[in-house]
Amino acid sequence: MDHLSFLESKAPAKKAVSVLPISMGIGSDVSGTADAPAYLLKLGFKEALAVAGFRAEVLPEVLVSNGVKGKEARLAAISKTVVAVREIVKGEISKGRKVLALGGDHALSIGTIAGAAEATADIGIIWIDAHADANTWKTSDSGNVHGMGASAVLGFGDERLTSVVKKKVKTKNFLYIGLKDLDQAEIDLIRSEKIAAVTMMDLLEHGFPMLAKEIQALQKKAKKVWVSMDM
């Protein structure tokens, strides 16, 4: 099968993928994020996967208590949700299936990566985001958990989040792509832990060859790679 086969509408859909809708919106102050999974599926996301050569099974939606108010209450609700997400992702990967999680704000990545890490030896993470999401409960001005996902899976931050990740991701197996808006505390963490990062400025100055080099370096260290992308 050549790469052109993915562009053929009649290509056989043989690659199984589990699509996990997660209607999480309490990790950020951005309205509408909780509605994204249902919206994408309504517009034909599953059908688009079939055209690309995947046999998609849409799993039951992970429902979130998006109406809770207050930082502490939201943190508790998020912690409970990402534990559920962790178990689903771990179970699907353990069955040999690929998982595509649809959010929702990026706080859900704590659960998806936690599950993938438990089911995979030496996992690598590619984090595609304009923001580092490397704040902690102590360094965050807003208290929004969507800005703490990366730090949590690496083992930094509030125990209510880090405890969800039973198998922490190694900092050497983590790659940022697309950074352009960071807090100083996040910059300090990335520097102190020597986490690989390709910023938007790097891409503008050096182009995609630099990006390809960093991805290849990650592939040499990690057996499997999980991609977490915030749009």
What kind of feature is each model-predicted range?
Residues 2-231:
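Conserved alpha-helical scaffold segments that buttress catalytic/binding sites
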